[in-house]
Amino acid sequence: MLLNQHQLELARGRAGREGPGKCFRLFQECEFDKLAESTVPEIKRCNLSNVVLQLKALGIDDIIGFDFIEKPPRTSILKSLEQLILLGALTDDYKLSDPVGKQMSRLPLDPMYSKALIVSSEFKCLEEMLIVVSMLSVESIFFTPREKLEEARAARKSFESTEGDHITLVNVYRAASECLEKSKNASAKEKTMEKALNRWCWENFINYRSLRHARDVHSQIQGHVQQMGLNLSSCGDDMVQFRRCLTAAFFLNAAIRQPDGSFRALGTGQSVQMHPSSVLFRTKPDCVIFNELVRTTQNYIKNITRIDPLWLAELAPQYYATED
């Protein structure tokens, strides 16, 4: 994948470093000339909401006038300020809100995930939201070897929820925890328990490293929310309550189905498609919330859960006005 001229020049410099060598580029020089000279700094191409939130927590009010090492676009700063106001982290006069904004700034997460954890405490499903945030913070939890495609699909079906991907992730995490609990009863040795979990992951086509990472993230975030005094509760099997909580947390990422089967992201107005990896891919619900927008040849939404569209105006009236 061609990135920029500077990186390609660095690669060329490796030829001949340890001994005689040559560098061959499998593209024309005119293509090289079209590339950017260097990588655009991350702060100029990423969501700045967490950066802005942390600066506000440090008492810095003038974000636009702040002396960044690399100045991000003004529009990106304004967009982040607007998002933080909608999430309740900032007041209308751009001050850090109390308690929500202060709580969000204490969590080492994307502000939307931080808000999700705070909201879930009110909805009495913090345990489930901890799982979802942890699982979304790591690489894909599923793996599908080409030579065992059908077996992997069959194994995944045992975890799938007809309500969407978030609850599917909860099901995987709960099943893994049950496996660990069983092995703990059989043997108190940690190494034996990890071997049992590794074997369970292999049998169910779950990425063991990703799952272990998710469990570590879960433990870390749980420590933060407990220090903040949030109510660590579970909704059990009441997934309607959990989906309502997801709506209240991720209302900025809602999409509604169009007559042609595509979706329209309500926050941006973009036409988007459901990613084939979603458990809802073949069902096409009327309204969903999602966590990720992937741009390839098309705009795809990933990590999706079906919701009732009426919940949007009920749970996020600051963003969705109802029509008389």
Predicted regions and their residues:
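Conserved segment of the helicase C-terminal RecA-like domain
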Residues: M1-L35, S49-L53
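Second RecA-like catalytic domain
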Residues: F27-D324
